[in-house]
Amino acid sequence: MKQRTLSIIKPDALKKKVVGKIIDRFESNGLEVVAMKRLHLSVKDAENFYAIHRERPFFKDLIEFMVSGPVVVMVLEGKDAVAKNRDLMGATDPKLAQKGTIRADFAESIDANAVHGSDSLENAHNEIAFFFAARDL
């Protein structure tokens, strides 16, 4: 089934200048970029986006990291886009990620792990709406 999902290329990947390589992974695996923008998250936006993690011990570090530099936010579309994106990203901890996944190839740590991807179709819908107006899609 054709779906849309949200992907964020995080500040560590932008600093390494691997944005193009990451986008190529998506496109060469059947995911089309239907909307994209580069921005610098404010603390408030990062806190709102990651509100589900507010009570977790890593929340403060996550917010500091996500506002430490620009990010690239994209809507990816394709067959089973949510699951495909998750597979391409690999495990959250790059040390556990399979060889050939984005995190195994480009991430440094569980915190600086290169990419974010929606974990469900419902969250994809909400996350896309957080960054993109319907007219932009």
Swiss-Prot record:
The keyword Methyltransferase does not apply. ATP binds at K10, F58, R86, T92, R103, N113. Coiled coil: none annotated. PROSITE patterns: NDPK, NDPK_LIKE. It is found in: Cytoplasm. Transmembrane segments: none annotated. InterPro entries: NDK-like_dom, NDK-like_dom_sf, Nucleoside_diP_kinase, Nucleoside_diP_kinase_AS. SMART domains: NDK. The active site is at H116 (pros-phosphohistidine intermediate). The keyword Membrane does not apply. It holds the Pfam family NDK. It catalyses: a 2'-deoxyribonucleoside 5'-diphosphate + ATP = a 2'-deoxyribonucleoside 5'-triphosphate + ADP; a ribonucleoside 5'-diphosphate + ATP = a ribonucleoside 5'-triphosphate + ADP. Its main location: cytoplasm. One of its GO terms (cellular component) is cytoplasm. Belongs to the NDK family. PANTHER family: NUCLEOSIDE DIPHOSPHATE KINASE (PTHR46161), NUCLEOSIDE DIPHOSPHATE KINASE DDB_G0292928-RELATED (PTHR46161:SF3). This is Nucleoside diphosphate kinase.
